[in-house]
Every structure is written in structure tokens, then in C-alpha cells.
């Protein structure tokens, strides 16, 4: 019986989903000069909580999107793709890591969390 559970968890390990993160509510009350750095930290915190991994890697395009309007004027929302992947590095502490990439959208209206087929 433990084998079946183990096999199921292995299949569920590698997954990719799209989320909309409301940065506005996460940055409420944060000083101007700390907004963009805090936004990146909050994105990492969100990804870590959702995917259950401590190793979270942010794509440079997402970082550029967050910082695009400056340190003070962070976008209200961002659409991201969270991909939980296997760590190929043999001497890594964690077996899995999460890659957070930016998904450009014209409007956030009606968007929901959706599973994405692995590329």
C-alpha cells in the first residue's frame, strides 16, 4: 500500500499552474523605497506557500515587470506561472524547486487559477 501512495505523490510533484497575485494588498503600508523589493519577496513567499518548496527562483522577465515603473510604483496585480520542477543538481538540499515566470495579460478580469500542461 505505501508504494501506491509514493507513486501518486511522485506524479503530483511536477506541476505547472497560473495564478494572479494581488500585489496591492500585499504592499499596503510599505514605504516607497521598499515597495519593489518587498513585491519580489511577496511573490517568492506566495510561490513557496502554494507549491510547498523552499527553493523559489524568479524569472528575470518577472523581475523586470515588477521594477519597470520604478521602486515606488509597483503594478497592482501580476499574472504568474508557477512550475514545480525537479532539481537536477545532485548535491542540492531540496529535491524540488519552483520557477516563477511572468505571463503577460491585457486584463485581469475573469481570470482564475488554471493548470498548465507541461511543456
Swiss-Prot record:
GO terms for molecular function: structural constituent of ribosome. It comes from the Eukaryota. The keyword Transferase does not apply. Keywords: Ribonucleoprotein, Ribosomal protein. Pfam families: Ribosomal_L31e. Disulfide bonds: none annotated. PANTHER family: 60S RIBOSOMAL PROTEIN L31. This is Large ribosomal subunit protein eL31. GO terms for biological process: cytoplasmic translation. GO terms for cellular component: cytosolic large ribosomal subunit. InterPro entries: Ribosomal_eL31, Ribosomal_eL31_CS, Ribosomal_eL31_dom_sf. Belongs to the eukaryotic ribosomal protein eL31 family.
